[in-house]
């Protein structure tokens, strides 16, 4: 029973969605093909940090031909300061890296001209703007290194930004020989996942400044939850505000900073830590998203890695802290500890009270990524100095825009220094049209999460009852990873009680759910492959969408380090599932069929 038509490999997910950030990976082999990247220059879609989207590729080709030397390639950025960071990163391995900065001057409704800006015009002091484009040019051999910067920092321009520039370029640039003007994609005609929403009233889109202001309010927990139509929107004046939902009384929109991607928020949190504290090693606590570890390793002195993220690892961490403090008591033993709540993909929750106690004792920063737990379900800010979130996931839900946020804990010991640095150095590079889209997508966040949490718990209870871990000895499912079953005592400590302030309803308290993400391991790769390829839902990377997604996570994220990942408990055949808003019974039937198919594959192997 198919929820949606199967989308062929390489096409956007969801279909009929401009600026889709996902790519269809319907089979095991397709996933391997995607990660090997040999078709990256011709594929039509992909996750924007790993894949240069079609509009961006077209604009980059135009810039290479117009401003590049023979044998040069380029990356495009919205800010001179970010472009300089890319130049420095690539220049560490290659010579001949340079930045060209452009300004588009719109002379009237039809005509524009491009002005090349000189370095002595104070570019580093100018705010990012859609009228500025910054090109990092480098030798072709340096392209893989430049792509790493694009991937790890999440600072590149978005497809909407590229479309804006393509629409305003003068004819002498657009008519460059050899550049195809076609960016069309043939979509399927099945039901769009965008239909899975809670039916918010159509309201006028806000201007970008209003959208960003309300996004920051929404993230800070200042706005009332949207549990009825007619709630506060960005375009309304005199917004009604409710109590902060983060457990920190003084956090406001002024303590929230927006970024173009979640990884950009993480990268900036690390740069912030390095700027205000002694540059010691960091700690990566738990098996977190792969690129978080890479950022900690590639910028600064490196990091200590504790893949299990359990109480034993906390004991081992404390040994290191004691040793480093004994060696030099004049400085903190580590710079900062980075962790996820819960972790991706094993959904383990660290013991935040113990970690916070160590942070207070040894004077290091705590940075918590709450993307999987999300604002509605968990309260982690009281334990953190900095909370980072990928807004591209459940906050948006529609898989058509990227975004990230960084929140400072006003009660943190280092808040004054952190806030002062951000006031002096924060640069808003979040493209206006992306912010407007994100604001619109996130208006019904609470209702969507409630539906998704209910669906995910029902699916996990069903699948776990058929797992070896739960006593089903002959099952093909080895284990289900979900916060309800993995380190539940740690998750429960931070599980949120949501106050309902809707005047049309009686006052009540609702407990946050366990989130919409879970992972499954199998007794063999044959079982994993059969289960994955027979799942009648979208099969694509990412998570937190309004529609159900599945992905072969380990193959996609750790293709070149499968043995190392397995040693950390992340098996090759792990299937990660992000649950959507579909009918619960329909989802149960879909997964029951996939389970039956996996059993048959093992029986006939």
Curated annotation (Swiss-Prot):
Substrate binds at residue 289. Pathway: Secondary metabolite biosynthesis. It comes from Amanita muscaria (strain Koide BX008). Cystathionine gamma-synthase-like enzyme; part of the gene cluster that mediates the biosynthesis of the psychoactive metabolites ibotenic acid and muscimol. The first committed step is glutamate hydroxylation by the 2-oxoglutarate-dependent dioxygenase iboH, and the last step is decarboxylation of ibotenic acid to muscimol by the decarboxylase iboD. The order of the intermediate reactions is somewhat ambiguous. IboA likely activates the carboxylic acid at position 5 to introduce an amide bond, and the flavin monooxygenase iboF generates the N-O bond. PANTHER family: CYSTATHIONINE GAMMA-SYNTHASE-RELATED (PTHR42699:SF1), PTHR42699. Keywords: Lyase, Pyridoxal phosphate. This is Cystathionine gamma-synthase-like enzyme iboG1. Belongs to the trans-sulfuration enzymes family. Signal peptide: none annotated. GO terms for biological process: transsulfuration. Induction: Expression is highly induced during artificial growth in symbiosis with Populus, which is close to its natural condition.
């Amino acid at each position: 029973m198919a929820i949606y038509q199967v989308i062929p490999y390489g096409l956007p997910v969801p279909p009929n969605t401009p600026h889709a950030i996902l790519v269809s990976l319907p089979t095991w082999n397709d996933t391997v093909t995607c990660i090997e990247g040999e078709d990256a220059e011709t594929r039509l879609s992909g996750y924007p940090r790993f894949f240069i989207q079609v509009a961006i590729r077209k604009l980059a080709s135009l810039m290479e031909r117009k401003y590049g030397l023979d044998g040069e390639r380029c990356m495009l950025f919205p800010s001179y300061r970010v472009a300089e960071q890319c130049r420095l990163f690539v220049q560490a391995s290659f010579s001949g890296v340079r930045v060209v900065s452009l300004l588009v001057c719109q002379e009237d409704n039809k005509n524009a001209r491009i002005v090349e800006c000189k370095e002595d015009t104070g570019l580093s002091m100018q705010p990012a703007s859609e009228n500025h484009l910054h090109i990092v040019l480098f030798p072709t051999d340096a392209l893989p290194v430049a792509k790493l910067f694009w991937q790890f920092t999440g600072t590149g321009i978005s497809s909407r930004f590229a479309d804006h520039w393509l629409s305003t370029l003068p004819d002498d640039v657009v008519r460059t020989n050899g550049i195809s003007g076609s960016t069309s994609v043939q979509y399927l005609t099945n039901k769009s996942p965008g239909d899975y929403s809670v039916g918010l009233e159509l309201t006028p889109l806000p201007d970008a400044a209003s959208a960003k202001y309300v996004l920051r309010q929404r993230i800070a927990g200042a706005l009332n939850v949207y549990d009825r139509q007619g709630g506060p929107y960005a375009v309304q004046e005199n917004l009604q505000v409710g109590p902060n939902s983060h457990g920190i009384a003084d956090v406001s929109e002024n303590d929230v900073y927006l970024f173009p991607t979640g990884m950009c928020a993480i990268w900036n949190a690390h740069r912030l830590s390095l700027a205000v504290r002694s540059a010691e090693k960091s700690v990566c606590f738990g098996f977190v998203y792969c690129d978080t570890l890479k950022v900690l390793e590639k910028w600064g002195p490196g990091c200590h890695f504790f893949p299990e993220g359990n109480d034993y690892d906390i004991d081992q961490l404390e040994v290191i802290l004691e040793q480093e403090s004994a060696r030099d008591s004049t400085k903190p033993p580590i710079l900062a500890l980075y962790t996820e709540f819960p972790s991706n993909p094993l959904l383990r929750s660290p013991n935040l009270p113990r970690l916070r106690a160590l942070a207070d004792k040894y004077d290091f920063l705590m940075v918590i990524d709450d993307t999987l737990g999300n604002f509605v379900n968990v309260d982690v800010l009281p334990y953190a100095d900095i909370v980072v979130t990928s807004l591209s996931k459940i906050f948006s839900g529609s898989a058509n825009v990227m975004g990230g946020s960084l929140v400072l804990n006003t009660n943190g010991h280092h808040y004054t220094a952190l806030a002062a640095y951000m006031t002096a150095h924060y640069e808003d590079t979040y493209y206006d049209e992306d912010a407007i889209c994100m604001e619109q997508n996130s208006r019904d966040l609470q209702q969507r999460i409630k539906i998704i949490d209910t669906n995910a718990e029902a699916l996990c209870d069903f699948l776990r009852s058929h797992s070896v871990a739960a006593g089903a000895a002959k099952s093909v499912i080895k284990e289900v990873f979900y916060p309800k079953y993995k380190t539940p005592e740690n998750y429960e400590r931070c599980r949120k009680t949501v106050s309902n302030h809707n005047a049309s309803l009686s006052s009540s308290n609702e407990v946050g759910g366990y989130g919409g993400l879970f992972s499954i391991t199998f007794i063999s790769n044959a079982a994993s492959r059969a289960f994955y390829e027979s799942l009648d839902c979208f099969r694509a990377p990412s998570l937190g969408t309004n529609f159900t997604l599945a992905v072969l996570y380990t193959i996609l994220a750790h293709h070149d380090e499968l043995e190392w990942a397995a040693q950390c408990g992340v098996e090759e055949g792990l299937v990660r599932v992000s649950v959507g808003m579909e009918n619960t019974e329909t989802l149960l039937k879909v997964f029951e069929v996939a389970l039956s198919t996996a059993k048959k594959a093992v029986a006939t192997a």
